[in-house]
A protein has these predicted regions:
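C-terminal motif of bacterial Sec signal peptides marking the signal peptidase cleavage site
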Residues: 18-21
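Low-complexity, Pro/Ser/Thr- and charge-rich linker/hinge segments at domain boundaries
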Residues: 37-38, 115-144, 217
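Multi-bladed beta-propeller domains
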Residues: 30-40, 73-90, 157-173, 203-220, ...
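Hydrophobic beta-strand positions that form the internal "hydrophobic ladder"
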Residues: 187-188, 230-233, 293-296, 358
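Short, conserved, GDST-rich strand-edge loop motifs in beta-rich repeat architectures
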Residues: 132-145, 235-257, 298-315, 361-373
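Residue-level detector of Asp-centered blade-edge/turn motifs that repeat once per structural unit
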Residues: 182-184, 228-229, 291-292, 353-354
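Conserved beta-strand position repeated across blades of beta-propeller domains
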Residues: 179-181, 225, 288, 350
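Contiguous beta-strand segments within globular domains
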Residues: 39-60
Length: 373
């Protein structure tokens, strides 16, 4: 028995020597230098309840030590593989200590010269926390491997991930465009393509499938946005195509041959639109209600001969008044960004919950900016 206890003590001592966050001597003669870290967290601002911001050096053969310093915490993480995994408990304590301030990060590393180098930067920590769940669609990268996909949620203060819906249960059909009403996890929608095709509205334990028709013919809905009241949902209806270039650096081209915006009345189970949102002379898409519910922001481009003139398509950012009591729109459209004048194209507009900030993507042309370098 004594022998066994001795082995346990020796093993425990060895583990303590490798323990991240334990005292680690820092190189005294490190020279200031740049290094590309992934992900790049330099000077970012994060919510106080975010999970550890683990990162790595560009070469897994690089040795390094990372120091995280706040007023009351001093964490040191050694690595022989270029990967820095920050202990959960120590990160939480450091983030709590740095609320409204910053964590000073010092990354010591050895490059090809085998000399110690040093990169310093701050990570700012907000006094505020964010919603506890992040929801996203997970699919293989590329443009063909869509047979396995799902909508997942991850707890932001750790790395626990759970499926909301996985397409293994639906015959490997496409699921996409999930959207929540005012970040309410119990009230959401998502689209299902092919098998069991349609748009599904989830309200607590109730699930309804909706199908919008035009002159008796069902058509698919795409980009959604809830009205803050929960009574309406704005959708785009897109005839989307995908082509491939032989020599262009943007190898894949995704474009709309037509698109309009329709509004679905949740309580009355009906869809409606107006000419300013569904003109055959324009491509209307990416609707987004403002937080007060009194305006709809959307993108619109002049229709052209597609796909031949795809590079001529540039989307304006527009706004139209909306009366949620009557369910009616205004008679004119305001231009927030004139694509014809600016020479760029707008997509995916979003208004901050307080209504003070507007976020959107800008690209040289088109509306599928993720493929445009």
């Amino acid at each position: 028995m004594k022998r066994t206890k001795g082995y346990k003590i020796i093993l425990l001592s060895g583990l303590l020597l490798l323990c991240p966050g334990c005292s680690e001597d820092l190189p005294a003669d490190a020279e200031i230098a740049e290094v590309a870290l992934f992900p790049d967290y330099e000077e970012v601002t994060v919510p106080a309840n975010i999970a550890p911001l683990n990162f790595k050096l560009p070469n897994e053969q690089m040795r390094g030590i990372t120091r995280l310093k706040t007023i009351h915490k001093d964490i040191r993480i050694p690595s022989r593989s270029g990967v820095f995994n920050i202990p959960m408990d120590e990160w939480k304590e450091a983030a709590e200590d740095a609320k409204g301030d910053k964590i000073d990060v010092s990354v010591y590393f050895k490059d090809s010269s085998n000399a110690w180098k040093l990169k310093r930067f701050p990570i700012f920590v907000s006094e505020d926390s964010m919603d506890n769940y992040l929801t996203y669609r997970r699919i293989f990268p590329g443009y063909r491997m869509w047979g396995e996909m799902g909508i997942y949620q991850r707890t932001v203060d750790n790395f626990v991930e759970n499926p909301v819906i996985n397409n293994r249960r639906t015959g490997n059909s496409c699921v996409n465009c999930h959207s929540f009403c005012r970040q309410d996890g119990s009230k959401m929608l998502f689209h299902q393509r092919s098998n069991y095709g349609g748009t599904y509205l989830v309200d607590g334990s109730d699930v309804d499938k909706i199908s919008v028709t035009d002159q008796g013919k069902a058509f698919g809905l795409a980009y959604p946005y809830w009205h803050p009241s929960g009574k309406y949902i704005a959708f785009s209806h897109n005839d989307t195509r995908q082509d491939f270039h032989y020599s262009d650096r943007n190898r894949i081209e995704v474009y709309d041959k037509s698109s309009d915006i329709v509004i679905y009345h949740v309580e009355e189970h009906r869809a409606f639109t107006v000419p300013l949102l569904s003109s055959p002379a324009s491509y209307e898409t990416f609707p987004a209600f403002t937080p007060d519910g009194k305006s709809l922001i959307f993108c619109s481009a002049d229709s052209v001969n597609m796909p031949d003139e795809y590079r001529k398509v540039r989307y304006h950012l527009l706004r139209i008044a909306f009366d949620p009591e009557k369910g009616t729109f205004g008679q004119q459209v305001d231009t927030l960004y004139n694509a014809r004048k600016e020479g760029r194209s707008i997509s995916f507009p979003r208004v901050s919950p307080d209504g003070k900030r507007l976020l959107y993507a800008v690209s040289d042309y088109g509306n599928f900016s993720i493929w445009h370098r």
